[in-house]
């Protein structure tokens, strides 16, 4: 009986996790669609100074990201 209870609890957790993942997918799709911005649109927002953490070049004022914004030159 205990094994059946544990099995039912595990199944409930798996189903609830799957439901949460399905709710997040529309937001991910919006993020994917918004990544197609031009450089001018990207520069409208604040850019990071030298030595600030970054994940891509367009986040830095220098447009040079190597885990941190670096200075060109």
UniProtKB/Swiss-Prot annotation:
Belongs to the conotoxin O2 superfamily. One of its GO terms (molecular function) is ion channel inhibitor activity. This is Conotoxin MaI51. The modification Pyrrolidone carboxylic acid is found at residue 46. The keyword Disulfide bond applies. The modification Isoleucine amide is found at residue 72. The keyword Secreted applies. Expressed by the venom duct. It is found in: Secreted. Residues 1-19 form the signal peptide. Its main location: secreted. The presence of a 'disulfide through disulfide knot' structurally defines this protein as a knottin. The cysteine framework is VI/VII (C-C-CC-C-C). Keywords: Amidation, Cleavage on pair of basic residues, Disulfide bond, Knottin, Neurotoxin, Pyrrolidone carboxylic acid, Secreted, Signal, Toxin. Disulfide bonds join 47-61, 54-65, 60-69. One of its GO terms (cellular component) is extracellular region. Residues 20-41 form a propeptide. It holds the Pfam family Conotoxin.
């Amino acid at each position: 009986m205990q094994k059946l209870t544990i099995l039912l609890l595990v199944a409930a957790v798996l189903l609830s996790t799957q439901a949460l993942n399905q709710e997040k997918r529309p937001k991910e799709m919006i993020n994917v669609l918004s990544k197609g911005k031009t450089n001018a649109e990207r520069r409208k927002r604040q850019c990071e100074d030298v030595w600030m953490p970054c994940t891509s070049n367009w986040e830095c004022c220098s447009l040079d990201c190597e885990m941190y914004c670096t200075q060109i030159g």
